[in-house]
């Protein structure tokens, strides 16, 4: 709970977007929620307990994200406590494959869905239904569009939009040198200054095309409990294994072009990454209340 409006969960705040759209356009927009194997049951029970936030139950569908095996530093696949292959979620880029495996794309087509907004649950200011976003995409005649923010400063740790081999892409902050970070164009703006905030919209045609083309995998060094060859359960104190995941922005490289809509940070970005500190429940609550209490 964020402790706002009062004590609304992030899911309820997002659902409010959809209920507002119902008021404005007299239609219940389908809501597809990707969960993980670990939290799927708990998430569904949470919705049931809260009466689906008074949104039609048949308009909300859950589907489970895919997983990939984890490997140790020796390259061998790890086993979990039950002695079976240890797996981890395959990243938010796995949404395309998961949508096909769980018949989500088919359901969308049967419901006449043409545009799909894909956004995070951990941002209470995310706009689930943005008329301007879809309007720009249609006007520019592209199959995808993403939202961006101007970087807070050259060294802000965010991925940024760019062109790679003539196609849209996002370059991660770890790949941006100090020189690149400070580089400016003739108007004095940062060359690498359009932050990707993981709020994207895809045409169903793009979803189908991307879903039939594998995205690259990235490795992340993580700490994971596992069973060793003797059958002992090992709980490491430091990272000991690699998980593999794909990122949603890697899908941009599958497209010839896409549009970017720059938005205001104060109006659309209040990420929740922890309980306290930067990008926390505390800061998100403050940003959310500040936005909704504007005169």
List PLM regions with ranges:
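N-terminal glycine-rich phosphate-binding loop and ensuing alpha1 helix
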Residues: 1-58, 69, 80-98, 105-106, ...
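Short hydrophobic/aromatic-rich motifs at helix boundaries and adjacent loops
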Residues: 14, 76, 178-179
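A structural signal for isolated positions on well-ordered beta-strands in alpha/beta enzyme cores
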Residues: 30-32, 61, 145, 259
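A general secondary-structure junction signal
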Residues: 35, 64-66, 262-264
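Short, internal active-site loops enriched in acidic
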Residues: 36-40, 123, 266
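Residue-level signal for inorganic ion chemistry
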Residues: 43, 122, 203
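Conserved beta-loop-beta/alpha segment of the NTase-like Rossmann-fold superfamily
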Residues: 52, 57-156
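Catalytic core of tubulin tyrosine ligase-like
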Residues: 108, 112-117, 125-129, 134-294
